[in-house]
Amino acid sequence: MIAASTPDAGCVALPGLSGNLFVVTGAAGGQGAQEALLLAANGADVIAADLREDAPDLRAAADDLPGSVTYRRLDVTSEEQWRDLADSLAGRAVKGLVNNAGVTQRTRIGDVVREDWDRVLAINVTGPMLGIQALLPLMGPGSSIVNIGSAAGLTGHYTAAYTTSKWALRGLTHSCVTELGPRGIRANIVHPGYIRTEMTADAPAPFLDANVTIAPLHRGGEPEEVANVVVFLLSDAAAYVTGAEIGVDGGQFRSGVATFLSEAVRSAQHPAASALPH
């Protein structure tokens, strides 16, 4: 079950969220769901999009929140579906877009299948670009784009397609900063490390153990911890923050453990095809 992440009593709600509209992809579960729920907990209206037909747990968790969560099935690689989503908003202003949908592929470079390579790049890079293109006409000054990268996008992991896609997403983010800044639109990217979700449970045990053991904080992250950073970046509290790259990884990247983690994956002899969230 998905639990709503509601601000503690007495906390001041983040400015610029209540009453505004946000779109979050990959929102049927994991950190995407928590991002949608935290926005709704701050009074925002959220379009939670995902490839699944429905997300009943997400909708149930949002029932008692001050904002709203509307679920919509979306293939982020479909230009037509993005266009239909934009048209369905009837010209309502979009305050923020979170490009959270993503998959990985744990495969040696020499074993990468072209079809799998194309799929990872289509979802992780082309999807965010199509979303930005479709919603940009509805975004004005004060709007915000948050792309979800990965610690793999800061170094070289044993996941060639995934790592390449996250480096590319950084480039797309930087282009948005330069091009959209004069229009008052901000763009930032968040780099999660190992985040505990139902989808990361099938990752190789040596990889998970290495994440917990070697990270300076000695634990995995929770989806809510990523959501906290994402929602801050969407809010007016971050009105002068654009071009930021924020790691939510327990210090893994800065402690230089990327090579060890890559070796842990390599040694695990895990099946090649595996889709994981960030």
Where do the language-model regions lie?
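Short C-terminal tail/terminal secondary-structure segment
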Residues: 2-13, 242-278
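Canonical Rossmann dinucleotide-binding motif of NAD(H)/NADP(H)-dependent dehydrogenases/reductases
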Residues: 12-47
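Substrate-binding pocket helix/loop in short-chain dehydrogenase/reductase
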Residues: 108-109, 116-118, 211
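C-terminal substrate-recognition "lid" of short-chain dehydrogenase/reductases
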Residues: 129, 138, 219-248, 253
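A short, exposed helix-loop element centered on a Lys and neighboring polar residues
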Residues: 132-133, 174
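Alpha-helical segment proximal to the catalytic Tyr-Lys
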Residues: 137, 178-182, 239
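Catalytic loop of short-chain dehydrogenase/reductase
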Residues: 146-168, 173-182
